């Protein structure tokens, strides 16, 4: 699965913002627009027993250039909420369901 960080017109969004993957399927988050973005999973909104720090970028770590990527593989089934730390206040949030 590929998720774009930022819309082509510069919007502060994940595209798609809600999606599903199979357990063990790689998710590639790809910076699309000219803003620094990152991917942080919300420790309160992921399946129990999953360590958010092991699947998240650091809040200070950013994908600065268009085309830069961050890949993660989720195996525990359930719903995971994530956000872009710099733009969470602007509504740059998403959700993935692992089936």
From Swiss-Prot:
Residues annotated as domain Plastocyanin-like: 1-99
Compartment(s) of residence: Plastid, Chloroplast thylakoid membrane
Cofactor or coenzyme needed: Cu(2+)
Keywords: Chloroplast, Copper, Electron transport, Membrane, Metal-binding, Plastid, Thylakoid, Transport
Residues engaged in binding Cu cation: 37, 84, 87, 92
A GO CC annotation given for this chain: chloroplast thylakoid membrane
CDD domains per the UniProt record, alphabetical: Plastocyanin (cd04219)
One Pfam family recorded for the sequence: Copper-bind
GO molecular function, one term: copper ion binding
Membrane topology summary: Peripheral membrane protein
Disulfide bonds: none
PROSITE patterns noted in UniProt: COPPER_BLUE
Family to which the UniProt record says this protein belongs: Belongs to the plastocyanin family.
Function: Participates in electron transfer between P700 and the cytochrome b6-f complex in photosystem I.
Name of the protein in its database record: Plastocyanin
Protein source organism: Lactuca sativa
């Amino acid at each position: 699965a590929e998720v774009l960080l930022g819309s082509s017109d510069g919007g502060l969004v994940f595209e798609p913002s809600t999606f599903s993957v199979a357990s063990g399927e790689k998710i590639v988050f790809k910076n699309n627009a000219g803003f620094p973005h990152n991917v942080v999973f919300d420790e309160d909104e992921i399946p129990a027993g999953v360590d958010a720090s092991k699947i998240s970028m650091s809040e200070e770590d950013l994908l600065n250039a268009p085309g830069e990527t961050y890949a993660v593989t989720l195996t525990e089934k359930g719903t995971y909420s994530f956000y872009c730390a710099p733009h969470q206040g602007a509504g740059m949030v998403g959700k993935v369901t692992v089936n």
